[in-house]
């Protein structure tokens, strides 16, 4: 009787272990974590930081994007390094490498493996990129982060720069003080967020994308509003494993 009981326990534990391993293996390593929501900032004026980036425990292979708390700049994490951009003048900015910042809403993921491909030459604009990503990632878990590397023929990026003490109750008010910057023939990296179900949460109401661009010399960085991508442009998608 004791022998049968021991065998039963052993089999049960073995099945539990296998189930646990299977469940762990089935979880994608690039799962996007979202903190806060764009609509709470834009419509409810919740400008305080909901996440301190320095508290993210695993910074290895980390990627992420969002605004600085109180809409005082932009944040981009790429290859485990965190960058904050802030306004200096209407024509210049400061880009600082730091994790000592907070964001009112933020999206991030640890991505250790990428699938690289060359973006078709016909994909040049944000609208074309959105349609292309939607078409080729039907089997990829969503939302997901992606990366682009290459030269941008033309681009417009912005840095939010809300005056201190401002109250916000609409997107128009949230963008008070925002400054746009134009780029021409700049080598750059773009980290983007794609989802068809996160409008007003992490993307604006008219798009599936939220992207931040940083030049390869790390001197300019901001939220990407317009772009003409120059071929060849490399697209990196997270490997689902």
Segments the model singles out, each with a brief description of its role:
Residues 17-20:
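C-terminal motif of bacterial Sec signal peptides marking the signal peptidase cleavage site
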Residues 84-144:
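Contiguous hydrophobic, core-forming segments of folded domains
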Residues 212-241:
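C-terminal structured interaction module
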Residues 163-217:
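Short, hydrophobic/π-rich interface segment
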Residues 119-179:
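Mid-length scaffold segments of soluble, non-membrane domains
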